[in-house]
Amino acid sequence: MVSFKAGINLGGWISQYQVFSKEHFDTFITEKDIETIAEAGFDHVRLPFDYPIIESDDNVGEYKEDGLSYIDRCLEWCKKYNLGLVLDMHHAPGYRFQDFKTSTLFEDPNQQKRFVDIWRFLAKRYINEREHIAFELLNEVVEPDSTRWNKLMLECVKAIREIDSTRWLYIGGNNYNSPDELKNLADIDDDYIVYNFHFYNPFFFTHQKAHWSESAMAYNRTVKYPGQYEGIEEFVKNNPKYSFMMELNNLKLNKELLRKDLKPAIEFREKKKCKLYCGEFGVIAIADLESRIKWHEDYISLLEEYDIGGAVWNYKKMDFEIYNEDRKPVSQELVNILARRKT
């Protein structure tokens, strides 16, 4: 049996790719990468995929074997090296987290049907691969509240269950899979559901100077962990639009802060008696390496303490790389921590 405790994300391969090309898809991740991951001690990968890989907007309902072949080969490699695979829809018809303000998925019945039909198709395709592959329905929902996501999620679960009653399904809450939003998910009486959250706290440490975050770029400070944010009062005084950051003044960045921010997920599990999974966590690669190692050490120790599986973001590139282009770890100590190897 495979385990889903110590995982790593394969972002940037068939999701969030820079260019839609056969050359990229054939070379970004190969069997050698999966072998490297397994040899490091990881027990699973999370494979984000974007729907255009397998379905064209011009031919709805016709699924592309050339795109599906990348999922197939990743699954075969994972089976060869005894790894689990979490298949995560990162970009759905009418929705992706980067463009949530222009999303149409939650108001367009045609897009919703496409979303459910894709999962229905994948459930049939991988009906005999229950041990190695789990399904994560949608990455990082961002909605005013959980109402529309709950409705679509329940419809999708029902469709999958008509085909496969024991497939592990991973379901995340609103607001970018926030631990605080798990409590607002619709209740499901199903023994094969795992509740998924993401964890990038404290944000201005894990995303320091992130080029895609207006607030991180504006603050533009090097932040160390453990430590504190510097210059908050002066920054807010000069940038009043970020007045919300005053609550970060004198905040101690340490393991107890991580525990506090993880608490909503733990309380949700205690109340619901369910399984939890952290589908993404990590620290931007431009952060101080020593701080990066210490944050992961503290966070992994909490996941271990609370018996929660998870997958670090990200195997390579995507600004959070754990490995470089030559499959060399940025830090062997960091890899050992992430693979939960006791040294």
Curated annotation (Swiss-Prot):
Modification after translation: The signal sequence was not cleaved in the protein expressed in E.coli.
Hydrolase is among the record's keywords: yes
Entry keywords, A to Z: Carbohydrate metabolism, Cellulose degradation, Glycosidase, Hydrolase, Polysaccharide degradation, Signal
Reactions catalysed, as given in the entry: Endohydrolysis of (1->4)-beta-D-glucosidic linkages in cellulose, lichenin and cereal beta-D-glucans
Gene3D superfamilies listed in its UniProt record: Glycosidases
Signal peptide (UniProt feature, chain positions): 1-21
GO molecular function: beta-glucosidase activity; cellulase activity
Pathway(s) of this molecule: Glycan metabolism; cellulose degradation
The EC number(s) this enzyme carries: 3.2.1.4
Top EC class for this record: hydrolase
Pfam families to which the protein is assigned, alphabetical: Cellulase (PF00150)
InterPro entries: Glyco_hydro_5, Glyco_hydro_5_CS, Glycoside_hydrolase_SF, Glycosyl_hydrolase_5
Catalytic-site annotation from UniProt: 140, 280
GO biological processes: cellulose catabolic process
Keyword Transcription regulation: no
GO terms under cellular component: cell surface; extracellular region
Similarity field: Belongs to the glycosyl hydrolase 5 (cellulase A) family.
Function: This enzyme catalyzes the endohydrolysis of 1,4-beta-glucosidic linkages in cellulose, lichenin and cereal beta-D-glucans.
Protein's UniProt name: Endoglucanase C307
Gene expressing this chain: celC307
